[in-house]
């Protein structure tokens, strides 16, 4: 969360990852302290990033596995459009895909689907070889299906 992470990033050195749904009005702040964004799902947000970012960012495009935008993410066609725009940036780097398992879907099924999507995506975007998937309750299944980054903040810091 931007409101929680921004102050911490100024006092603790490291590589800071932003995870969560992006709001246009928060992008200037997010890009001031984060090094990696895990949840980009709109071209308009990337256009803002290009204007306001003070340093280069690594970016994961968030794909929706069930077509719903309620938990963030875009359909794979929209994600490919977004990735095409990012890959031509002189400052920012497309590093992979991110997804959240849909509610009511078994983690194994969701992450198997994501793994297949990611493999097909890398045909067009071979440098996007990272996969951000899995949270505190399902990260083991995500790792089995190729996750390189897991999001387990609530296991470490507690629920927010």
Give the location of each predicted region.
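Conserved alpha/beta-domain cores
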Residues: 1-137, 143-145, 157
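Gly/Pro- and small hydrophobic-enriched strand-loop and loop-to-helix capping segments
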Residues: 147-160
């Amino acid at each position: 969360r931007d409101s929680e992470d921004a102050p911490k990033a100024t006092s603790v050195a490291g590589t800071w990852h932003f995870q969560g749904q992006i709001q246009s009005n928060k992008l200037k702040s997010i890009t001031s302290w984060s090094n990696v964004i895990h949840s980009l799902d709109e071209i308009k947000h990337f256009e803002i990033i290009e204007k306001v970012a003070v340093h280069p960012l690594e970016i994961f495009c968030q794909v929706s596995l069930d077509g719903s935008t309620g938990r963030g993410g875009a359909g794979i066609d929209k994600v490919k459009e977004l990735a095409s725009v990012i890959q031509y940036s002189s400052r920012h780097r497309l590093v992979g895909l991110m997804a959240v398992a849909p509610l009511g879907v078994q983690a194994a099924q969701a992450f198997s689907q994501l793994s297949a999507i990611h493999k097909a995506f890398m045909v067009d975007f071979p440098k996007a070889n990272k996969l951000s998937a899995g949270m505190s309750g399902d990260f083991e299944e995500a790792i089995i299906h190729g996750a390189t980054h897991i999001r387990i903040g609530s296991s470490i810091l507690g629920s927010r």
